[in-house]
């Protein structure tokens, strides 16, 4: 029986009660003291898999904590849930669908049945279709209306059709293929469209319209604007097929737009947008880094899939990260989680993980529709490297909130400059160390006295220089940001999110909150342009509509 058919109140489980008791016992736990008392703590709380090294020793845990968290995973039948996910059972209850993004990275020889049909041949058929297109563009065989080769590819999409592909293509910029530049157009903002098209020539530009329904408002409006721009630059309707392709499950709408059916790449309803970069949605990735590197990306994710399915929970990277998140969110009161990549090319990973985590686990009812009895997904935020140290790290160190953090850092830079990377790596480690160690009152006073401060100044300033420490963090180290390791890294967080959804009993694969805003947006638009005379549902919205209409002259 699929795991979601037996919803649970996690707070009523014996393992949850045991964790509550343990949390009270851990109230005065000190990481600083734990490291001093146990020379093997680092060894005990680190593991390596799929090209990733995880140090989770700087957490408010001991061996008993880990055992109790694993006990919770066992009580919610996490093993059964993982099996359900990979075997294509219905894990998205509200939409009655499986969630099979993992199928997109499985070998061609595998067999996976959905409604009695093996989907793997279709998965690899699309992969071959992508391979063919990428080869034609890279070889200069796909030409625009003036017979010049394509030099620029613009991906028009939003949400999962944008964030994942943008992350990967920019993270793997060192693997970029010469001759083709990739761009992204997501927001329904004329300024973004204007800034992008200023860099392009219509005769050598190919647009990818990525929308499962071919009806996503922002994507469709941008596609229509791109089409109008193409025609205004000298392109013709007859040659439109050379400049527009689609990734969609709505072939009829794409054909009506002017895209040839053979240039429409399919999507399946068992792949959610935020999990779709492994599908034809990843076409701009393949165009950016080449097909062999795209397949390495898939292989890296597949290796993490294997690890997730086979490793004992005590040594299972996604499971441990997920359970630590539950530990802080449900037992220590943490409301957010910081993602801190110390690599310029990984600067967009926080945006992708925001959608992955918050759209998946931002839920308040369980799979069966009953209210949850505990907090669920945290706010995900953060930013790149040393920049954050001079911005929001102050709050991490001395603020009143407990905010767990993930540091992500490579050992090797693709672009070494003097000793910059050694300093970058040192900063990453020292930040996690400072969060853990802090600075005591005695240390603050000694530091001030060593600098020659008077006793009056010491007593006046010492409290300001005290840093509580004992702030938890994980550190993920990769040798370098390669396609395979990046694939494993993204899959790691996908599985982390799923594990947490299983613990809380919620559906990680729907997003009904997003749909409400879309529905209301149509009515607001109609009132803005005057095609709807009835008042808005509330005075605030109507007042803002009136304010716009009284001043807009567009």
Swiss-Prot record:
Cellular compartments per GO CC: cytosol
Enzyme class: isomerase
InterPro entries to which the protein is assigned, alphabetical: G6P_Isomerase (IPR001672), G6P_Isomerase_C (IPR023096), Phosphoglucose_isomerase_CS (IPR018189), SIS_dom_sf (IPR046348), SIS_PGI_1 (IPR035476), SIS_PGI_2 (IPR035482)
Major localization listed first in the record, in broad terms: cytoplasm
Keywords: Cytoplasm, Gluconeogenesis, Glycolysis, Isomerase
Active-site residues per Swiss-Prot or TrEMBL entry: 359 (proton donor), 390, 518
UniProt subcellular location: Cytoplasm
EC code(s) of this entry: 5.3.1.9
Record carries keyword Cytoplasm: yes
Origin: domain of life: Bacteria
UniProt-listed GO biological process terms: gluconeogenesis; glucose 6-phosphate metabolic process; glycolytic process
Reaction equation(s) it catalyzes: alpha-D-glucose 6-phosphate = beta-D-fructose 6-phosphate
PROSITE patterns: P_GLUCOSE_ISOMERASE_1, P_GLUCOSE_ISOMERASE_2, P_GLUCOSE_ISOMERASE_3
Pathway annotation: Carbohydrate biosynthesis; gluconeogenesis; Carbohydrate degradation; glycolysis; D-glyceraldehyde 3-phosphate and glycerone phosphate from D-glucose: step 2/4
GO terms for MF: carbohydrate derivative binding; glucose-6-phosphate isomerase activity; monosaccharide binding
PANTHER family named among the record's database cross-references: GLUCOSE-6-PHOSPHATE ISOMERASE
Sequence similarity: Belongs to the GPI family.
Chain's role: Catalyzes the reversible isomerization of glucose-6-phosphate to fructose-6-phosphate.
The protein, known as: Glucose-6-phosphate isomerase
Originating organism: Pseudomonas fluorescens
């Amino acid at each position: 029986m699929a795991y979601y058919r037996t919803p649970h109140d996690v707070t009523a489980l014996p393992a949850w009660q045991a964790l509550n008791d343990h949390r009270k016992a851990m109230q005065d736990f000190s990481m600083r003291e734990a490291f001093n008392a146990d020379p093997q703590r680092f060894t005990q709380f680190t593991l390596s898999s799929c090209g990733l090294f995880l140090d989770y020793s700087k957490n408010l845990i001991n061996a008993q904590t880990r055992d109790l968290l694993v006990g919770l995973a066992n009580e919610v039948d996490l093993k059964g849930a993982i099996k359900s996910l990979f075997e294509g059972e219905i894990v998205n209850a509200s939409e009655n669908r499986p969630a099979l993004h993992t199928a997109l990275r499985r070998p061609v020889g595998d067999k996976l049945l959905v409604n009695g049909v093996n989907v793997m041949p279709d998965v690899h058929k699309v992969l071959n279709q992508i391979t063919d297109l990428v080869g034609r563009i890279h070889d200069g065989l796909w030409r625009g209306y003036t017979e010049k080769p394509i030099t620029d590819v613009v991906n028009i999409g939003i949400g999962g059709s944008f964030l994942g592909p943008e992350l990967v293509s920019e993270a793997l910029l060192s693997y970029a293929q010469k001759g083709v530049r990739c761009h992204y157009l997501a927001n329904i903002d004329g300024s973004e469209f204007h800034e992008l098209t200023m860099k392009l020539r219509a005769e050598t530009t190919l647009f990818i319209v990525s929308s499962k329904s071919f009806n996503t408002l922002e994507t469709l409006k941008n596609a229509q604007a791109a089409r109008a721009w193409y025609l205004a630059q000298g392109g013709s309707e007859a040659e439109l097929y050379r400049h527009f392709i689609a990734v969609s499950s709505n072939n009829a709408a794409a054909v009506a737009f002017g895209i040839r059916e053979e240039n429409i790449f399919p999507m399946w309803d068992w792949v959610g947008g935020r999990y779709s970069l492994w599908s034809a949605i990843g076409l701009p990735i393949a165009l950016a880094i080449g097909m062999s590197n795209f397949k390495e990306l898939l292989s890296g994710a597949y290796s993490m899939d294997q690890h997730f399915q086979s490793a004992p929970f005590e040594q299972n990277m996604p499971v441990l990260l997920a359970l630590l998140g539950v530990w802080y969110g449900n037992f220590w009161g943490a409301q957010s989680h910081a993602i801190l990549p110390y690599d310029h090319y990984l600067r967009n990973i926080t945006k992708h993980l925001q959608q992955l985590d918050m759209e998946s686990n931002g839920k308040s009812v369980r799979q069966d529709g009953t209210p949850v009895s505990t907090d669920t997904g945290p706010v995900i935020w953060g930013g790149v490297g040393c920049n954050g140290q001079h911005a929001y790290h102050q709050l991490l160190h001395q603020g009143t909130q407990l905010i767990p953090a993930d540091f992500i850092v490579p050992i090797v830079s693709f672009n070494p400059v003097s000793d910059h990377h050694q300093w970058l790596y040192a900063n990453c480690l020292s930040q996690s160390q400072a969060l853990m160690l802090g600075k005591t009152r005695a240390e603050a006073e000694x530091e001030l006295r060593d600098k020659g401060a008077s006793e009056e100044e010491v007593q006046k300033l010492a409290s300001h220089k005290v840093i509580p420490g004992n702030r938890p963090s994980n550190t993920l180290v990769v040798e370098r940001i390669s396609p395979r390791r990046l694939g494993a890294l993204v899959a790691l967080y996908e599985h982390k999110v799923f594990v947490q959804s299983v613990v809380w009993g919620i559906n990680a694969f729907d997003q009904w909150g997003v749909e409400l805003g879309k529905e209301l947006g149509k009515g607001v638009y109609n009132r803005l342009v005057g095609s709807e005379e009835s008042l808005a549902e509330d005075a605030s919205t109507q007042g803002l509509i009136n304010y716009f209409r009284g001043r807009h002259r567009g």
